[in-house]
Amino acid sequence: MALYEHVFLARQDITPQQVDGLVEQYKGVIEANGGKVGRVENWGLKSLTYRIKKNRKAHYVLMDIDAPAPAVHEVERQMRINEDILRYMTIAVDKHEEGPSAMMQKRDRDDRPRGEGRGPRDDRGPRPDRGDRDDRPRRPREDRA
């Protein structure tokens, strides 16, 4: 059987539970046609670069699929019919990547705390107080007539 990565975008106005229902529906289609679904990642609600069918946001989902080609064709056929699916893309891969996808790694990196929690400033020490800056001499102004 061939290996595929399948990403689909669902409408913004459906609930996360409905997105999970769509995932289960398509998992059932793949398993009924002799395939299996490996990793499923829900990337959440993200902004679209441009509007698709009057939607500015979409729920993104990634599925790793190990299935024969007819199973993938059936999933794509059902996604074309479903009004909740805005876009989908299926790519044949040589092997599935281990661990989280690049999008999930980015989310984990973005979730790290910033500012005070980042650690010391090495040998520079804390930042000095800048005061109200009135202690500096004023720059001479040219009077315009």
Curated annotation (Swiss-Prot):
Q: Which domain of life is it from?
A: Bacteria
Q: Name one GO molecular function term.
A: structural constituent of ribosome
Q: What SUPFAM superfamilies does this protein map onto?
A: Ribosomal protein S6
- UniProt entry keywords in alphabetical sequence: Ribonucleoprotein, Ribosomal protein, RNA-binding, rRNA-binding
Q: Which N-terminal residues, if any, form the signal peptide? A: none
Pfam families reported for this sequence = Ribosomal_S6 (PF01250)
Q: Where is this region: Disordered?
A: 94-145
Example of a GO cellular component annotation carried by this entry: cytosolic small ribosomal subunit
Q: Which GO terms describe its biological process?
A: translation
- CDD domains cross-referenced by the UniProt entry: bS6
This chain's function reads: Binds together with bS18 to 16S ribosomal RNA.
Q: Which HAMAP family match?
A: Ribosomal_bS6
Family (UniProt):
Belongs to the bacterial ribosomal protein bS6 family.
Q: What protein name applies here? A: Small ribosomal subunit protein bS6
Originating organism? Sinorhizobium medicae (strain WSM419)
